[in-house]
């Protein structure tokens, strides 16, 4: 009687399953790549030392887009049975890490009007009176700043144009460019981005820092992976 070889439960298997699942969630992509750091024996026990995700030209179902991204998370425990039997990535612990996401002006506009950003703005409005409705059109990169617009209730719904530039970790400076943007509005925007935390399909991401050049905005984010994405969990 022949002895069947055990199923492959290596880091490559986890990377393949994670890639397949994430491609099933995204609407478009040029690249989705995972690199898993673990030994075969550790993964059999559900232990992973770290995971790196890289991607390019992503488009989500709700039109969150980016030129590229790279995320690195540390140690995590997964369910190895679910990985083999269900081809699913089910987390037993919450890994933490960092992401670097690069946006062009269209991407950043899509980010500003994404439902999770609107939810964050609404929550901030309830919590401490934030009052700014972001516009996705007309984003411009100039002199190391992102120039964008929105409307505020205190301004009677008039268009307000501001410039936002990084001034250090978890800190931005917002200045008026045009419209009814007083100190109250610019200071509120500074606080909003400095405290920004949103949930993107299981990943709780927080603003860390930003670099702006003539072609793109590069956001550095910290993250906690609360659950791995699934097409059954909703859209991003």
What are these regions (language model features)?
Residues 1-236:
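Extracellular/lumenal and peripheral-membrane lipid-interaction modules
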């Amino acid at each position: 009687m022949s002895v069947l070889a055990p199923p492959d439960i290596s880091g490559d298997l986890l990377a393949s399953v994670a890639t397949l699942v994430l491609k099933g969630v995204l609407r478009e992509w040029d690249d989705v790549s995972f690199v898993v750091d673990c030994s075969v024996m550790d993964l059999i026990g559900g232990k992973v030392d770290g995971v790196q995700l890289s991607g390019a030209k992503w488009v989500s179902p709700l039109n969150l887009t980016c030129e590229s991204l790279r995320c690195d998370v540390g140690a995590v425990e997964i369910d190895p049975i679910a990985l083999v039997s269900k081809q699913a990535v089910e987390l037993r612990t919450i890994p933490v890490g960092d992401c670097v996401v690069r946006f062009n002006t269209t991407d950043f506009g899509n980010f500003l009007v994404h439902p999770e950003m609107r939810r964050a703005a609404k929550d901030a409005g309830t919590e401490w009176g934030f009052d700014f409705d972001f516009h996705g059109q007309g984003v411009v990169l100039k002199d190391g700043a992102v120039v964008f617009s929105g409307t505020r209730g205190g301004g009677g719904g008039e268009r307000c144009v501001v410039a936002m530039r990084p001034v250090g970790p978890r800190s931005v400076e917002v200045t008026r460019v045009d419209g009814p943007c007083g100190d109250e509005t610019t200071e509120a925007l500074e606080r909003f981005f400095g405290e920004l935390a949103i949930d993107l399909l299981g990943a709780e991401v927080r603003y860390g820092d930003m670099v702006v050049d003539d072609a793109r905005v590069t956001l550095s984010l910290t993250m906690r992976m609360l659950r791995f994405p699934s097409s059954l969990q909703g859209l991003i």
